[in-house]
Design a protein with these regions (language model features):
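C-terminus-biased signal that marks the final domain/tail of proteins
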Residues: 7-293
Length: 293
């Protein structure tokens, strides 16, 4: 995981931190910096290096790398004045606010809790009642499959207090969709709506699968889906592909021209049929998704 931010007007370059996810762990990210404190470079610790020692980056024991001036720059700008060991990248360069927790961190939480039920203890954090941060990565209760990740891309907080299919906004057909903006005012009061993983404005999504047991030419698969992940079909695009499939090719329809042979337009059409009668129609879509995928 690498998080970075430009230095802004009057300065060149950017500051950053990168951490390697342990092999038995999973992580998540949703438009909000998640790297907080991290181990600093020292003579005794060979697992961490700064950008001054990038020549060591391929050493297998290295798990943390950071810009040598990531803390120095924060001090110069007045963003941080504590001890180096207390420096948090997220709290300094991308501090959490309400939307950062409820619209971003909540998506990571929903993914984590699918694979570690103990993550339910962070519900109070997601509800903005407490301020403890979630771990950057977790050990899942079992090994994840491609299907697990496809399901995660279709998440609307089902089974949680944030479940999009519940409440007045869901209407008579338990819709998991809410129109933008997420935050709005009505009669002088401010309201908000949840931001799930799957949304109607998604252009495309994918799951990258790397299979070391398969021939190199076909070992990599990009399970690629166009439009809303809730109603799309994830298609395997192999690393040995030599031409783009007709259904995904530029020129087969456009943003203004419908095409019955365009994967985007077909997925979009199915989704638009489902939205008004979600609880009636989506179960049928889900059955077909399972068979086709």
């Amino acid at each position: 995981i690498m998080e970075l931010i430009g230095k802004g007007p009057g300065s060149k370059g950017f500051v950053w931190v990168a951490r390697r996810i342990p092999d038995d762990c999973i992580s998540g990210h949703a438009n909000q910096a998640r790297i907080t404190t991290f181990p600093l470079e020292s003579r005794k610790d060979k697992t961490t290096i700064s950008s001054k020692n990038l020549k060591k980056i391929y050493n297998p024991e290295v798990t943390t790398v950071y810009a040598h001036d990531v803390i120095k720059f924060a001090r110069e700008k007045g963003y941080f004045n504590g001890k180096d060991a207390e420096f948090s990248f997220s709290d300094t360069y991308n501090p959490l606010d309400f939307s950062g927790v409820r619209a971003c961190e909540a998506r990571v939480w929903s993914f984590f809790r699918r694979h570690d039920r103990s993550m339910d203890k962070y519900l109070s954090y997601i509800m903005c009642d407490t301020k403890e941060r979630m771990p950057l990565w977790i050990v899942p209760e079992r090994k994840l499959s491609v299907k697990d990740l496809q399901d995660a891309m279709r998440d609307h907080y089902e089974g949680t207090p944030l479940d999009m299919s519940k409440g007045q906004g869901a209407g008579p057909f338990n819709s998991v969709y809410r129109m933008t903006p997420l935050i709005y005012k009505h009669n002088g009061k401010e309201y908000f709506q949840e931001r799930p993983v799957a949304t109607q404005q998604t252009g495309f999504s994918f799951i990258a699968q790397m299979r070391d047991y398969a021939p190199a030419e076909a070992g990599g698969i990009l399970w690629f889906g166009l439009d809303d992940a809730t109603c799309n079909i994830y298609v395997p695009i192999y690393s040995c592909i030599t031409e783009i499939p007709e259904s995904m090719r530029e020129g087969n329809g456009s943003i203004l021209d419908f095409s019955w042979t365009s994967a985007f337009w077909i997925n979009n059409w199915v989704a638009r049929m489902v939205y008004p009668r979600y609880s009636m129609l989506y179960p049928e879509v889900k059955k077909r998704q399972g068979k086709l995928e």
